[in-house]
Amino acid sequence: SLSHEKYYALGSGPARAMAAKIKDGNEEPVEELYKELGYRDSFDSTVLVIENDAVPPPAIVEKVAAACKVDPGKLTVIVTPTSSLAGGLQVVARVLEVAMHKAHALHFPLENIVDGFGSAPLCPPHPNFVKA
């Protein structure tokens, strides 16, 4: 999650696999899952999709860019309110990701998963983000 003062949002996209932090003098992925998987992306630009109805403050953009080791101008931030069609699609599109997280939580060997497919209904947008 991303937070700064009163701003809070969930983020997804390639930036999650690039973000790193220094812990005990060593660089490691920000997200524990990527540390466990031994996976990290590296590129000169990246994208972060944010579930929120407001543009993130500059402090968050700068923090994410620094964690991904990219210039802030090379970080594309896509804001998708959950109450919008794009926001609803972004949530539904993660159905396979949720299944993979569940398999991981159950200690199923992820290297045994060769392919995956998921489907889920796309509900119409709703002005109330909780109901959406």
From Swiss-Prot:
UniProt keywords, alphabetically: Cytoplasm, Hydrolase, One-carbon metabolism
GO CC terms, sorted: cytoplasm
Keyword DNA-binding in record: no
Protein name per the record: Methenyltetrahydromethanopterin cyclohydrolase
Main location: cytoplasm
Protein family (similarity comment): Belongs to the MCH family.
Enzyme class, UniProt record, top EC level: hydrolase
